Amino acid sequence: MEIKGHYQFSKEYQTILDESIEIDPTFDYAYWAKSIAYLKSGDFVTWKKLIDKAVELNPKEHLGYRGWCRYQFFRDYKGAIKDIEKLDSLVDYDIGQSQNGTYHLNIAKGLCYKAIGEKEKAIAIIEKQIKLNEEEDFVGAYDYLHLGVLYLETEKFEKAFETFKKQSENNELAENQYYLALTYLQLGKPVEAKSCLEKAKELYIEGRKMSDPYSNPMDKIYLEDIENKK
């Protein structure tokens, strides 16, 4: 029986993986593949047992995935940092992207440091990775936005302004115009701020906003956030 063509939640899919593990208990891929259905169905205890086994057997292959899941699904920021930094210590090549492809794992690590209150460290990490991304002409969809918000939160208003402008050029979002409005307010420019809020509302209604099918991204806003600032 082949796994191709079977749905992750199906009995057939899981049975094939179970049989693979019986044949070779060190087959890390099978543990990882089995874990995905449990994560999506909300059985996090079983997911953790399986993904931990996959990491034990092949840390280079699975640490990045587990670290990303810790960030995205569980808000286990310290655990995510630990996994991503461990992966970085094990390999001599680029540690790669998040499972959903939205972020380089170093950007995710920076966001984790922000979440635990280490904003200056977060800025340094994200600045460094964005510079590398720019050299590859592959800046993430939300990279400039997150960095701009960090600048705003640490009162580096001119840097925030410049970075939000880069986000506009790269991938305009309701969030970007919203935080740009907050920056204009800090710079004493209420007219410009009002214009940005109006633009943010238009973009939000058009659906040009941060989104993820499984969780709310960091720095995401809602329509009421815009309305409350107008």
Task: For the regions a language model picked out, list residue spans one by one.
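Terminal, low-structured helical/coil segments at or just beyond the last alpha-helical repeat
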Residues: 192-230
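Structural motif corresponding to the intra-repeat A-B loop/turn of tetratricopeptide repeats
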Residues: 7, 41, 73-74, 116, ...
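TPR alpha-solenoid repeat register
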Residues: 30, 62-64, 97, 105, ...
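Flexible helix-coil transition and linker loops at the boundaries of alpha-helical arrays
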Residues: 18-22, 52-57, 88-102, 131-138, ...
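N-terminal leader/linker segments that initiate helical-solenoid repeat arrays
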Residues: 1-32, 41, 49, 227-230
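Residue at a conserved register position within TPR or TPR-like alpha-solenoid repeats
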Residues: 38, 70-71, 113, 151, ...
